[in-house]
A protein has these predicted regions:
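N-terminal nucleophile
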Residues: 1-293
Length: 293
């Protein structure tokens, strides 16, 4: 299978005195064709973290599934008694052990080589009471998966923490800088939903064949809960999409619904007496992140 690229982001969002960790991705897979319904953000058995990927899906999906199961099989990690840094270590051990089990290689190939996939892993680190983001990647110099902590931006932007992996990351970063500058936010402290807006616009302008489909979104809150979101696509009047897939005619996703052109707002179905009740309640994130009560 040819390498499958994407654009996947994770950043710490700051609104007033509140922070939350946001993951966003496109939904396209390419392998001689385009398929725009592929999950790229994954919840885990522990509720304080998310993981996303960019790269070859023949590696990515087995690695994520087995890593998730390994966390679920380990009560101290599943119950969050161990910090997410321990979960990150579990992920790397699983990735490397699985890669070592690749065999029956093509003639003349001695090792499995570069898997062509990268991951963003992040969540709330309760021991240090802060959000953390790591990039998990293959390092050819040691022939293993390893990690890199995502560091804050420099130049008066120390509160801005952002991970980008996949296709056209340089362009995405340039667009983000220009967007922040146009709003008078450079230098500044923290992101709102600007990285999502950049992803949305790059999907819409169709300038990159590897980036497409409805945006995906997930969040981790400081009370150690993760939440996936549905996104109305291609705009607020469109069908809700969850992890890239459009809701079927009979479906009503039990997820907050995001307007891609007002991503600081989201709606959810109100508590209803029956499944036929389609009333929505709109909530704006002000000083507190969205909480499903």
């Amino acid at each position: 299978m040819e390498a499958t690229i994407t654009l996947s982001l994770a950043w710490i969002r700051s609104v007033g005195n509140t922070q939350e960790l946001v993951f966003a991705s496109d939904s396209r897979l390419r392998a001689g064709q385009a398929w725009d319904v592929a999950p790229k953000i994954f919840t885990l058995p522990r509720s304080d973290a998310l993981i996303s990927f960019a790269g070859a899906t023949d590696y990515a999906y087995p690695l994520v599934v087995q890593m998730s199961q390994a966390i679920g099989f380990f009560p101290a990690s599943r119950d969050r008694r161990n910090d997410i840094s321990v979960a990150k270590g579990i992920a790397l051990k699983v990735f490397n052990e699985m890669r070592e089990n690749i065999h029956d290689l093509p003639r003349g190939q001695m090792t499995a080589g570069d898997p062509g996939v990268r991951f963003i892993f992040g969540g709330y680190q309760w021991r240090q009471k802060r959000f953390r983001i790591w990039e998990l990647h293959y390092d050819a110099s040691i022939d293993r998966f390893t990690f890199r902590p995502v560091q804050p931006w420099h130049g008066g932007n120390s509160g801005r923490v952002l991970a980008m992996i996949g296709d056209a990351t340089d362009e995405a970063r340039d667009r983000l800088v220009e967007l922040l500058r146009s709003r008078g936010k450079l230098p500044g402290n923290g992101f709102d939903m600007e990285p999502f807006e950049v992803l949305r616009d790059m999907i819409r302008d169709r300038s990159h064949p590897a980036i497409g489909g409805a945006p995906q979104l997930g969040k981790v809150y400081s009370y150690m809960r993760s939440q996936l979101f549905a996104v109305a696509w291609p705009d607020a009047t469109g069908v809700p999409h969850a992890l890239g897939r459009a809701a079927l005619g009979f479906e009503r996703f039990d997820l907050p619904l995001l307007d891609p052109d007002a991503p600081h707002l989201h709606s959810r179905h109100a508590a209803a007496a029956s499944d036929d009740d389609e009333e929505f309640v709109t909530t704006e994130l002000a000083d507190e992140p969205y909480e499903d009560d």
